[in-house]
Amino acid sequence: MIDITRDTFETEIIQASMQTPVLVDFWAPWCGPCKSLGPILEKLETDYAGRFILAKVDSDQEQEIAAAFGIRSIPTCILMVQGKPVDGFQGAMPESQVKAFLDKHLPPAGEAAEDDTTYDTESTEFAQISPEAQI
């Protein structure tokens, strides 16, 4: 798990997602649902053993990043692949639903993502986000 700031955003999210999918968790310390989702995400990052990177953005401290992603409620998670948002979800979800979300986008365990893997970046509301242009 990586805590993201404006200074580390480019390296830890955009550049890192070129090699490994990055799940960006927008949260705040006062947010009750964030407190229940956070441990689930951290457990899954361990369980998935390198298939994705968990990056956490404190929306209170990093308002510029949250604004660039159009975050309106927390928790919000956005999956970044090859520098672009491919999908996401809002609100706390049980572990089974988070796993289903991850399994939809990540290569199976033991398989690296193919270089020619394509992601449908047009079909979700998150496709409209262009954070690299605004941060």
Residue ranges and their predicted role:
Residues 1-19:
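N-terminal leader/targeting and pre-domain segments
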Residues 16, 20, 47, 51, ...:
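Conserved, well-folded catalytic cores of nucleic-acid-processing
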Residues 28-34:
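Hydrophobic heptad-repeat coiled-coil signature
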